[in-house]
Amino acid sequence: MPLNLPLSALEQHDEFIGRHIGPCSTEMATMLTAIGADSLEQLIDQTVPAAIRLPADLPLPAPRREHEALADLKAMASKNVVNKSCIGMGYYDTLTPKVILRNVMENPGWYTAYTPYQAEIAQGRLEALMNFQQMVIDLTGLEIANASLLDEATAAAEAMTMARRVSKSKSNRFLVDANCFPQSIDVVKTRAAYFGFELVIGNIDAHKDGDFFGALLQYPGDNGEVRDLTDVIAGLKAKGTTVAVASDLMALVLLKSPGAMGADIALGSSQRFGIPMGFGGPHAAFFATREAFVRSMPGRIIGISKDARGNTAYRMALQTREQHIRREKANSNICTSQVLLANMAGMYVVYHGAEGLRTIAGRIHRLTAILAEGLKRASVNLLTKQFYDTVHFDLGARAESVYNDALAAGYNLRRVSAGVLGISFDETTTRDDVATLFKLIAQTTLDVATIDAQVAAADSALPDSLIRSDAVLQHPVFNTHHTEHEMLRYLKSLQNKDLALDHSMISLGSCTMKLNATSEMIPVTWPEFGGIHPFAPRDQAVGYLEMITSLTEWLKTVTGFDAICMQPNSGAQGEYAGLVAIDRFHASRGEEHRNVCLIPKSAHGTNPATAQMANMKVVVVDCDENGNVDVADLKAKAEEHKDDLACLMITYPSTHGVFEEAIRDICAIVHANGGQVYMDGANLNAQVGLTSPGFIGADVSHMNLHKTFAIPHGGGGPGMGPIGLKAHLAPFMADHVVQPTGDANRVNAGQGAVSAAPFGSASILTISWMYLAMLGGAGVKKATQVAILNANYVAKQLNAHYPVLYVGKNGRVAHECILDIRPIKAATGIAEIDIAKRLMDYGFHAPTVSFPVAGTIMVEPTESESKAELDRFIGAMIAIREEIRQIENGVWTADNNPLKNAPHSQADVMDAEWKHPYSRQQAVFPLPWVAANKFWPSVNRIDDVYGDRNLNCACPPMEAYAD
């Protein structure tokens, strides 16, 4: 390196670009030569239609070095005020066990994995999710649970639609207890409007004899009241009502379960099991029901099956319920959920165990009882009579001064109504907190020890009929790992069973498994971000709001939109928020009848599932032989439905991995017939810096921050799916009933929410902020260019072995490519799933299987993979093709070969008798480099049919693990 470089070069402000992008300049040159392109710019010219290319580079800030970006974000974080939160309302401060913080939340072996569709290399997190399900089953008293939903409010909305599916009642009315959390009521209102349900919100006692298809109750209630709902539930069910109870897992450690009271569904948030509040998330919602309703339950379910050796193995059960298969007939559009957070919550319970949880839950209740008893003795008007952790009290004219005094002392109380305040306690609450708050309220001191002794000796604040009597959390997993050594080793043992980005590339098409840089992840753990309640006073969240505003402006620049709504917690939820905005727009113009949604047949399964959630009629548009939207068919159907056309949902580049030349014409056709264009942002990673949805002609689009903008997939969540909107749709995006997301005079102020928190999972927005801050305008454009280069390199190298199904007019693919396996299957019986399983033996996760075309695999390498890693993957795929040739040539039989027997486990190679026509080395070390970094699948191929026919979604007994 010459010593006379200018200082600007030595400062390396663009250093992170080289850290994020896999190939170096020399490797890029080699790859460009291999694909027949003179330069990166020429490749892009050959790939992206000139008509949609941006005329100038993105006006984003210059890139920052990692430590500079961290310092800038830390300066924002320092503007947040972390008071002790006593607001409650479903969000509570908590203590994350450090062994879980370090070894799960901060561990790329856990947070960079994908949804466990390839179960043989995901046994660790599948077991962890089974623990979560077992914990939920035990505490709710129901028979089956899913592996998480997005948040409590959307879980409540899902409960309503599930109730409609399973209820035998002919009523169109749904009862909502007025004592539910207001944010849950708000989201349920939004969802109900698009299903045409009549919502009845009120006192449940006044309506318990009414005619409803479903009901939503809260236990404990929003006001803290704990009541036995057994009789109410029995009365409702006698008339055919399906009853859902929103509850609190910590409270259920002590309280009678919803299942014991007769509930059909139980739901809520697992946040207080070790997950920081994070200004609203991310947090894993739980959802449980009766076994009879399992096929109608939304979300993913982990079940038990057996592998080819007959051993117990975990897998995702009943996948035919999901949106990617059933499309508009799916139970829900749920795709991303909250797997990482569910695993953390489950591990919190594993670590503390039943006894530890009872101690924590008992302490919370005792401190609340001490405060309540003190307030009663001080003649404070206590409004909550039977409580777990929350009390409301009427102070009349003194309420405002007490509220402000508490703020000054570092406590956030809840303003309930004029003169009424609320206090909720959590596991961080101390004796000193109780004494301080009592003095602020009663203006005298409290002898905590004396009151404690008296409360302990007296009758409980809860009647015996409400105290849990059944034993819970008895499975050995909840009673074994209580020392840190044991917990650490348990977590490590699970991690060792999973393949994540810390081992090798994950080339899942349409999933964008790029680098999740350590520097991007660090701020998520800062207490200045984790300790903020979503409904805290806005002047305590100045740093958050500054970060969100900054990210909003950057995303507007990147996408070409005029406004951003940060509320959706996933891409699928972003789709829903976008279609809701479109519907509200049409309604504002007196065109409520516009309800037809055009969707290409190649679309993601979430698109039709979301359209039906928004009460739209799906009309499928054909594709031509090249995989592009059939423009003539689109035009004919748009004109046929022009009086009722609401929108087109389209992915760009297409799900076939090609930049369609006619995209602007497609948008124009829809607009000419009165519709709006919704662009699915799943493939935005091929657009950034080169074009944008807004520039192309879309009216609204979601951005998968967990794809394009570096939030990790977490093994199936968290994610974020904010939407960008053009100015005419901006007034119709979601707002929030508790904490408005914008100015009070904004047109959409008060419009129904789609998520529980105003800014969704706000704490992980810091990841995308760091990503954009460190890459800058030049970096994000380079990332897109290299993503396209890597995909074309893979396509070129593999095309002779597996034909690339679709290419653009110049023979290029976008950021992903589809490899056609159908000729191989016709000749040998080897299917795409066999190739997927065999890749495990080479140390790779499979690409996307049989989407968007059955009998194919779709490869998306992303910009973050080096040429060396791409070459290893290419080498593995070519080696597998040569193995298939051995079957074609009759060397191996169609039913006994390395592909049909894949994956191979350590147990296989240790068998005394080897019954295969290929060697043990061929089975597990098929290429020389595999042995140096061997990943061992912990089970053999799993029997999916057996798992669904013998459904078991609870933790197996320990005997199941015996040899």
UniProtKB/Swiss-Prot annotation:
Molecular function terms, GO-annotated: glycine binding; glycine dehydrogenase (decarboxylating) activity; pyridoxal phosphate binding
Modified-residue entries (N6-(pyridoxal phosphate)lysine), positions: K707
GO CC field: cytosol; glycine cleavage complex
Required co-factors: pyridoxal 5'-phosphate
The reaction(s) this protein catalyses: N(6)-[(R)-lipoyl]-L-lysyl-[glycine-cleavage complex H protein] + glycine + H(+) = N(6)-[(R)-S(8)-aminomethyldihydrolipoyl]-L-lysyl-[glycine-cleavage complex H protein] + CO2
Gene3D superfamilies, A to Z: Aspartate Aminotransferase, domain 1, Type I PLP-dependent aspartate aminotransferase-like (Major domain)
GO biological process: glycine decarboxylation via glycine cleavage system
Entry's EC annotation: 1.4.4.2
SUPFAM superfamilies found in the cross-reference section: PLP-dependent transferases
UniProt entry keywords in alphabetical sequence: Oxidoreductase, Pyridoxal phosphate
Domain of life: Bacteria
Enzyme class: oxidoreductase
Xref: HAMAP family: GcvP
Free-text function comment from the UniProt entry: The glycine cleavage system catalyzes the degradation of glycine. The P protein binds the alpha-amino group of glycine through its pyridoxal phosphate cofactor; CO(2) is released and the remaining methylamine moiety is then transferred to the lipoamide cofactor of the H protein.
Family the entry assigns: Belongs to the GcvP family.
Quaternary data: The glycine cleavage system is composed of four proteins: P, T, L and H.
Name listed for the protein in its UniProt record: Glycine dehydrogenase (decarboxylating)
